[in-house]
Regions:
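N-terminal subdomain of nucleotide-sugar transferases
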Residues: 1-41
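Anion (oxyanion) recognition and catalysis
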Residues: 28, 90, 125
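A short, charged, and often flexible helix/loop element on the N-terminal side
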Residues: 35-64, 71-82
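An anion/phosphate-binding loop that grips the pyrophosphate of nucleotide cofactors and donors
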Residues: 66, 128
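Active-site proximal beta-strand in glycosyltransferases
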Residues: 68-70, 86-105
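A short, histidine- and acid-enriched strand-loop-helix "catalytic/donor-clamping" loop
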Residues: 74-78, 96-114
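Charged helix-capping and loop-helix junction motifs
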Residues: 82-87, 113-118
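Conserved small/polar residues in nucleotide/adenosyl-binding loops
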Residues: 130-132
Length: 132
């Protein structure tokens, strides 16, 4: 099985990176054909934009051979970034697993998203194979 996993770059200090690094330390990449793509780095806006573009280019390159796309998603900008990747994965008819991180997703969804954005996020989450 070929899995493409996306999330914050493994060098970022944060929860998503810690989980991903733990998966690598546990040998997940030895058990499945895993490609990890970091979609965000710490640093300037320019560095973040460059990382996002690089991630997008790599994603469309490896996506055709993938069986599953695993998105590590948190609130705010992380959610919007991952939904872009999810939409592309769905265009390629790929199965998508969403792993939601962080305790503030409900606050983001209910307090910081308009009704229109909530509807879009809900629609996308419902299109995933599984949402954990």
């Amino acid at each position: 099985m070929k899995v493409v996993m996306l999330g914050a770059d493994r060098s970022v200090k944060g929860g998503v990176s810690a989980v991903v690094n733990n998966l690598y330390e546990a040998g997940l990449d030895q058990r499945i054909d895993l490609t990890y793509i970091g979609t965000m780095v710490d640093g300037s806006t320019a560095a973040k934009l460059l990382k996002g573009v690089q991630a997008l280019l790599k994603f469309v390159t490896v996506l055709p051979k993938a069986d599953i796309v695993h998105l590590n998603m948190a609130a705010d900008a992380s959610c919007y970034r991952k939904l872009i990747f999810m939409q592309i994965a769905l265009w390629f008819h790929k199965k998508v697993v969403i792993h939601e991180h962080g305790g503030d997703f409900q606050g983001f969804y209910y307090k910081r998203c308009s009704a229109k954005r909530q509807a879009y996020i809900k629609k996308m989450l419902n299109l995933s194979l599984i949402h954990i």
